[in-house]
Amino acid sequence: MNKKIKTEAVDSLFDAILSLESREECYSFFEDLCTVNELLSLSQRFEVAAMLKCGKTYLEIAEKTGASTATISRVNRSLNYGNDGYELVFDRMGK
């Protein structure tokens, strides 16, 4: 865990997210919290991670998602050398 982000404010945000009970509640909360572009960027990174996990090439990912190679590379680095957060979520989602 990155100690730079471990703050009371971040803990409070994560507690708020964990309190959400449905996809509709997530839409309501995240539409209030994030700009459209911020939310689309987060979802793009998640899609990139899923495609990398499935063995897709950078070219295939860039064509489907519109992500830059820099974004794809950053996500790939997180998948390979990060805190296993993507893996945890993918396992729970059955991906």
Annotate each PLM feature:
Residues 1-20:
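General nucleic-acid-binding
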Residues 48, 72-79:
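Major-groove recognition helix of helix-turn-helix-like DNA-binding domains
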Residues 77-90:
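Short, solvent-exposed alpha-helical "recognition" segments
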Residues 25-44, 94:
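Short, Lys/Arg-enriched anionic-surface-contact patches
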Residues 60-65, 72:
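Short alpha-helical "recognition helix" segments of helix-turn-helix
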Residues 20-24, 36, 55:
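Residues at alpha-helix boundaries and the short loops/turns that link adjacent helices
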Residues 59, 87, 92-95:
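General marker for long, soluble alpha-helical cores
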Residues 42-56:
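Short, amphipathic alpha-helical "recognition" segments used to contact nucleic acids or chromatin
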